[in-house]
Curated annotation (Swiss-Prot):
The keyword GTP-binding applies. It comes from Methanocorpusculum labreanum (strain ATCC 43576 / DSM 4855 / Z). Catalyzes the GTP-dependent phosphorylation of the 3'-hydroxyl group of dephosphocoenzyme A to form coenzyme A (CoA). The keyword Membrane does not apply. It catalyses: 3'-dephospho-CoA + GTP = GDP + CoA + H(+). Pfam families: DUF359. GTP binds at D40, V41, V42, D59, E112, E135. Belongs to the GTP-dependent DPCK family. Its EC number is 2.7.1.237. InterPro entries: GTP-dep_dephospho-CoA_kin. GO terms for biological process: coenzyme A biosynthetic process. It comes from the Archaea. Pathway: Cofactor biosynthesis; coenzyme A biosynthesis. This is GTP-dependent dephospho-CoA kinase.
Amino acid sequence: MLTLPPENRWLFREPFGTVFSDFSMVLPYIEGKIFCTVGDVVTHNALSAGLIPSIGVIDGFTKRSPYLKMPEIQGHILHVTNPAGTITDELIAALRLAMDEIPCVVMVNGEEDLAVLPLTEILPDGAVILYGQPEEGLVICEVNKQLRANAKKLLTYFVSL
């Protein structure tokens, strides 16, 4: 299990990709691509727009409050435990399995926010990751060599337990 020490959490306040203020603005970027969502609101917005993420990673909360708007989930559902501020081996294994079970929702008991990092390694080049940036909008990241390098660098700030 990787744990992000509290003193390094500031590194994750900046978006990991391009920020859009409205979900409709990202539609041209995900058309015809494998795309994954991390977070309840962004997953809800994708499903409400009639789009089914290849992998949706949710925890039932938004801004630490229960999120009750989720439309009916389609596809396989995997349940994992991933405490806040961590990336567990269980989460990574579920994300890998989810690639073989598309469409799939990974329901996290704990927190899903950091799932973006392992997804950069698991997804193929050209896939897109969408996640919410509180008070800013929606972040879109296209998986490529540079994104993987950025994720790998951020992972150096974690400690292994």
